[in-house]
Amino acid sequence: EKPYKKIFGEFEGRHAATSAESETGDVKYHLGFAATRNVGGRDVRVSLIPNPSHLEFANPVLQGVARARQTILGGDGERDEATVVPISIHGDAAFPGEGVVAETFNMSRLRGYRVGGTLHIIANNQVGFTTDPNDGRSTHYSSDLAKGFEVPIVHVNAEDANTCIRVMQLGVEYRAKFGKDFLVDLVGYRRHGHNETDEPAFTQPAMYTQIRSHPSPRELWGERLVKEGTLAADEIQKLDEEIAANYERIQSSSSASDGEGEGPGEAVKAQDEAATATL
C-alpha cells in the first residue's frame, strides 16, 4: 500500500522530486505508484500506472504494459498470462461515454493483443461529475456496453464489504480458468464533490440531502460488528479515536519522500524498461 506519509505529503505539495522533468501538470491522485506486497508468504509486485485526466485513456496502455510483462516473465519469448493480472477501474459515466473502452474490449481476445483477461471494476457513484445517469447514457446499467463482448457482469452493493470480497474472488477465479474479462459494477455513491473544489449540492441537491443523512460505510460496518457481538460500541469509538490521532500525527510530519514504495517516476521507469526488454 502507499504510505500515508507519501499521500499527505503530495496533497500538501511536498513532492520527492521537484525538477521540471518530474512535473506532470496533472492532479496528484493521477500519479503512478509501484510497491511489493507479501501475500500468503509470496511477494506480489503491484503497479499503478499513471492515469491522466484523459478519461479511460489508460486502459489500452495497461493492456500493453501487462502483455509486455507477461512476455518478460514468461521467459524465452513465451508469454505467461498467469504472471500478470491487469485490473481496470472505471467511472460509471466514463465507461459508456468514452469510445476507447469499447475499442479496448474489442482487442481483448485478439491473438495480437490478448492478456488472458482483465478484471474491470466500475466505481459507480451514480453521477458523472454533475451529470445524472439518465442524461449520460442510453442504457439502464453503466456496464451494459460489456454485454456486447459477452463479459460476465456482477452488480454489487459497495456498502457490503463481505460480498465485495467474494465477488472479486469470483472474478479472479473466472479469469484464471477461462482467461477472459470479468466486470464488477460496484454500486455506491460519492459522499463529497468531484474534487476538492466541487460542492455537489449545487447540481444534485436532492441526492446529496439523502447522502448526507445516510450513515457512512464505516458506521454501518461498526453497527454490524456490534450487532454480531464482535466488538463493543466503546471499542469501536476507541479505534476511531486512535486512527484519527494517528492520521494527525502522520500528517504533521509527512513528506512525499517518506515511507517505502516507489513514486510515479519509478513506476514509469519500470514500464519503460519492460517495453524496451520486450522489443
Where do the protein language model's features map onto the residues?
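Conserved internal helical-beta-strand scaffold that buttresses enzyme catalytic cores
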Residues: 1-87, 93-101, 105-118, 124-138, ...
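Short, internal active-site loops enriched in acidic
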Residues: 91-94, 189-191
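Hydrophobic side chains in beta-strands
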Residues: 122-123, 186
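Conserved phosphate-handling catalytic cores of large alpha/beta enzymes
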Residues: 128-139, 147-193, 197, 201
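Active-site-proximal loop->helix
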Residues: 144
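A mobile, often basic/glycine-rich helix-loop segment
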Residues: 203-205
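Flexible glycine-/small-residue-enriched beta->alpha junction loops
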Residues: 208-214
